Amino acid sequence: MERHGEEQLDMDQIDLSMRFNPAHEVGISCGTVTIDPKRAKVLIIWNIRLQIHQLPKGRRNVEESWFDTALRETHEETGFAATPLALRVPTRAQLPKRALPNKGKGYKKPEILWDHVSREFIGTCSYPDPQSKSPCFKTVYFWAATCDSTSTPDKDTQDEGENLIPKWIDLADIEKFLRFEAEIAVVKKAVSDMKRSGHKIGEQ
């Protein structure tokens, strides 16, 4: 154990657990959990090629921000323009110095921000990418968003070769539709963050 400041850290254990991954072996995709709170519905897609229901998501463009990727991919795959939600998302992101409370000398930043309202991502799903022909570990970042499920989606927004059908389903039915447990968990996290931020879901 080595002492660094006030902390004792096992540098050998850190070294053993640390891994380097070249950029071409790291897959980053982004998507949204888009909810119509008035009608308690969530936007999903039916992937005709894979024959499964999924959340809308997709790969980043070069130098594109992750946040922009999530909104773009949602629109491309569904035709719906989602509006991102500012929520009390528990996050390890830090406040900039100018936004820190003036609590005097010795104030330590919290490890987790619990109640700060932001448009941070709500969670991730991670897995080895089975569709990649070379080694790739994929992480999908999700943001909470909203949209009117009765609005008319834009046409011809999907990329060539995509064959996806957008669907609005009742939030109560996500476990009947979504193929992956991790995506079910993401939807539940979005609902939880919305409720703890004061949003009413399914209440006229």
Regions found by a protein language model. Name each.
Residues 44-47:
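Short, acidic/hydrophobic/Gly-rich beta-strand patch recurrent on exposed beta strands
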Residues 52-56:
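Short small-residue beta-strand/loop micro-motif enriched in glycine and branched aliphatics
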